[in-house]
């Protein structure tokens, strides 16, 4: 279930301050954040945000197609290492 349209999208205050500061300066630098729950808003377009996945920060370039999604959707936390090998054939 999505968030109510009466409410504004959630964006962490510290992240919003950093983006607004870079927009006023006109600079582009990597913004490091742990806030995976923040929603991508149009003022973030064109910035590179390094999102924490539990182990490291993955740099993600924000495009216009990402608006409305959460930051955490673009930094996977689990790595698939393959299914467990079944050794029943070698035991026979």
Curated annotation (Swiss-Prot):
Give the superkingdom in one word: Eukaryota
Q: What is its main location?
A: plastid
Q: Name one GO molecular function term.
A: rRNA binding
UniProt-listed GO biological process terms: ribosomal small subunit assembly; translation
Localization, per the record, is: Plastid, Chloroplast
What GO terms fall under cellular component here?
chloroplast; mitochondrial small ribosomal subunit
- Name the PROSITE patterns for this protein: RIBOSOMAL_S19 (PS00323)
Q: Extract the InterPro entries matched here.
A: Ribosomal_uS19 (IPR002222), Ribosomal_uS19_bac-type (IPR005732), Ribosomal_uS19_CS (IPR020934), Ribosomal_uS19_SF (IPR023575)
Alphabetic keyword roster: Chloroplast, Plastid, Ribonucleoprotein, Ribosomal protein, RNA-binding, rRNA-binding
General function of this protein? Protein S19 forms a complex with S13 that binds strongly to the 16S ribosomal RNA.
Q: Which family does it belong to?
A: Belongs to the universal ribosomal protein uS19 family.
Please report the name of this protein according to its UniProt entry: Small ribosomal subunit protein uS19c
Q: Which organism is it from?
A: Cicer arietinum
Q: Which gene encodes it?
A: rps19
């Amino acid at each position: 279930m999505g968030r109510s349209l009466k409410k504004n999208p959630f964006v962490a205050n510290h992240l919003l301050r950093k983006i607004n500061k870079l927009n006023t300066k006109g600079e582009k630098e990597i913004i490091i954040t742990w806030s995976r729950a923040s929603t991508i808003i149009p003022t973030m377009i064109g910035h590179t945000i390094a999102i924490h996945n539990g182990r490291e920060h993955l740099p993600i370039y924000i495009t216009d197609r990402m608006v409305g999604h959460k930051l955490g959707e673009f930094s996977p936390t689990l790595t698939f290492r393959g299914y467990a090998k079944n050794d029943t054939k070698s035991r026979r």
